[in-house]
Structures are given as structure tokens and as C-alpha cells.
Amino acid sequence: MIDKYKIVSLVLTLSLIAALVRLVYSTNIAGPSAPQDDKASVLKIIHERKSVRSFTEQPVSREQLDTLVRAAMAAPTGKNMQPWKFIVIDDKEAMTQLSEQLPYAKMLKEAQAAVIVCGDMSVVDDNGKPSTNWVMDCSAATENLLLAAEAMGLGAVWTGVYPYEERLEAVKKAFNLPDNIIPLNMVPIGYPKGEQHPKDKYKPDNIHYNGW
């Protein structure tokens, strides 16, 4: 006669084994898929980034601004010189005044904050020479900042300062910048007003493989 308790014990054991098999299988499946999801998210952010020039009155916190600048500083630089400085502005009066001096940056009146990305000529290499790549390095930092803003649900736009003399003078004067600091651009930041759509800039004709 079959012991019913042994049968129950056997069923429970088999159920436990089946559960463990499912757990191991699902873990193996989920492992490789997670990076794929991350890649998809990164590519989505890159392709959805857009220049936002109109903002709501919703404030942007200093914690959010710090996150943006941290992302900017994660950019690559020649010789790892990191020849940059970042001026974070969340003073509405200062931004309004600057928007009146810089006709191309009228969106500063609506923005809740801005970041000025600057090259620092006091940063030198092992030979005592300042970076010759500061424009490229600071541009990479700016793109990181713009992508981070997109990922955080914020809007931003790259407004050029360098190499326009009148813009350089206006920004340097407004923020008392020393001679070794050159503002490359200014990025107004805020929450987008209305629906914004990215532009599809992909053009196959611009691609050449293995030569022209």
C-alpha cells in the first residue's frame, strides 16, 4: 500500500525542483535582455533629443542641475585634461537681463535655469600648454548635458557664444569671467511648453564606407 504522506512529499519535492528550474531559466533569460533594454533606452533618448526654446513655469531644482552637470563632466576629453568650467544660473533676474543683451537668447526669459559651458585656459598638460581641444571637449560635455536633460524630461537648447566677439563680451561682463575662462555656449533649461518633436536628420547620402 502506497504511503499517502510519501506521495505528498514527492509532489512537494517535484514542485520545488520545477520552481527552481523556472527561476534559473528566467534569470538566464533576463540577464542578457537587461543590457538590450538599456541600449534601447539610450538610443531612444539620442533620437528624441530636440532643441526646446519654450518653457513652462515649473521650477528646476539644484539637484536636477547638479545631475545635468555631472553628466556633462562624464564626457571624454583629450589627454583627460577636462579643460572646462560650468556656470550654473538659476537667478531669474540675471537670466532676464542677459536675454535683453543677447537677442539670440530670448528664451532665457522663460527658462528656469541655464548652464554656461566654458573652456578653462588655465588647465595645462604635462608640457605646460593649454588644451588645443577645449572646443571639442566642451562640445562633448554639452551634448552629454543635452541628452541628460532629455532623459530627465527637461527641455534645453544649445545657444552659441564662442567665437562671436559681442556675445563673448556680453557673457564675460555679465558674470565677471576671468581672462582664462572662455564661454563656449549657454544652455537654457526648463520643462518644455507644449508638444515638442525631434527632427529626423538621418541622411544615407552623408555616409561613405571605406573611402569617399
Predicted regions and their residues:
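Acidic, surface-exposed loops and disordered segments
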Residues: M1-W212
